[in-house]
Each structure stands twice: as C-alpha cells, then as structure tokens.
Swiss-Prot record:
GO terms for molecular function: GTP binding; magnesium ion binding; uracil phosphoribosyltransferase activity. The gene is upp. This is Uracil phosphoribosyltransferase. Coiled coil: none annotated. Pathway: Pyrimidine metabolism; UMP biosynthesis via salvage pathway; UMP from uracil: step 1/1. It is an enzyme of class 2 (transferase). 5-phospho-alpha-D-ribose 1-diphosphate binds at residues 79, 104, 131-139, 200. The lineage of its organism: Bacteria, Pseudomonadati, Pseudomonadota, Alphaproteobacteria, Caulobacterales. Its cofactor is Mg(2+).
Length: 209
C-alpha cells in the first residue's frame, strides 16, 4: 500500500500499547494521545518544502532553511481529533486549525456533519485531517469530501489506529490522499469498533464513560 505509512518507531508503538490497555487512566490516555500525535506529525511533515534564507547568528552570517509557502492546516474531526491536534500543535504551533464536526449514526454507521469552520484561504494550504480512529472510514471520507468541496487539493490523513476495512474504504474514495497510522488492525465488530483496537477513543480521552 504505497500511500499508507505505518509509523513503526519504538516510542510510537510503546505509547500505543499503553493506550490499548484498558487499565490506562483517562489522564494518562489523554497525555499518551498528545505525545503520540506529536511523534506521528514529525513523520507526516518530513517532506515539507523549504526555502533557503540568509540570517545572522551571533557569530557570523550564514544561509539557513525555513518551511516554504503558507502555514499548514490541521483539521481535527470532532471531538476526539482535538486530542491529537494538541500534540501536533506542540510541534507546529503556527499552524491554522479547521474544525469538522461529525458524529456516527449508530444505526447506519454513516457520518453526519453538524459543524464546519475553516480558514478562508484553506484551498491554498496543505491540510492534515486528524482523527484517532479509522474504523469504517465514513467520517474520514466525509471530512475529506467536505474539504475538497472548498477547493483543497493537498490533503493528508493521520490516525492512531486503523482497521483494514477503513483503510480500504478511504483509499477507494480518495486514492489521492496518503494515510499515516501507528497500526492497522484487521477486523471491525458489529458496532463498527476496531478489534482489538483501544475502545472508544472519545470516551477514553474525555472520561465520558
């Protein structure tokens, strides 16, 4: 799968294991999500374009390099994407943030949009869509379709954990959008949850169950 990257760094895998553990507290789970998102963001942004610039250090003039172009946009899918977005902003604090509110209909498992807010010039920016879980793929597909409707062409999708079915669905719907994840699990249960997964990422992040 040439457009799917599994981030196998030992720190990412260690933190994901702790998140999978059902005995991990809400406080620890939230911190681990933020830390893991920062590490994955490092991989996602490793090919950002650079400009050569001239600066002066306290010792001498020198050439150096800065990220080129407009500031990128993180687009967390509410609500759980917010936990990952914080970790990414730790690494790229100047990034803009778009918010995409989606919930999953528990009868149909389809994504239903209830909120959308993005920078006015989002079409000209790299947009990284963020959602901890890629299960059925419906939310990711809907979020990316919404962004494309606004003219966004440079898109990436980042999650902590994916199901193979979700990866396949997203690749079929948006073959131009590369995917980064810490792991791919093979199955979904009848409720659309990833197995073995890590449970409901939203409830575990916000302590709502």
């Amino acid at each position: 799968m040439s457009n799917v990257t599994v981030v196998s760094h030992p720190l990412v895998q260690h933190k994901l294991t702790k998140m999978r553990d059902k005995t991990t507290s809400t406080k620890t789970f939230r911190a681990l999500m933020r830390e893991t998102a920062t590490l994955i963001c490092y991989e996602v942004t490793r090919d950002l374009p650079m400009d050569e610039v001239q600066i002066e250090t306290p010792v001498a003039p020198t050439k150096a390099y800065e990220i080129a172009g407009k500031k990128l946009v993180f687009a967390p899918i509410l609500r759980t994407g917010l936990g990952m977005c914080e970790g990414m902003l730790d690494l790229v604090p100047s990034a803009r943030v778009a918010h995409i509110g989606l919930y999953r209909d528990h009868e149909t498992l389809e994504a239903v949009e209830y909120y959308f807010k993005a920078p006015e010039d989002i079409a000209g920016r790299l947009v990284i869509v963020v959602d901890p879980m890629l299960a059925t793929g419906h939310s990711a597909i809907a979020a990316i379709a919404r962004l494309k409707h606004y003219g966004v062409t440079n898109l990436r999708f980042v999650c902590l954990l994916a199901a193979q079915a979700g990866v396949d669905a997203l690749r079929e719907a948006h073959p131009d959008v590369p995917i980064w994840t810490a792991a791919i699990d093979q199955t979904l249960n009848d409720h659309g949850y990833i197995v073995p997964g890590l449970g409901d990422a939203g409830d575990r992040t916000f302590g709502t169950r």
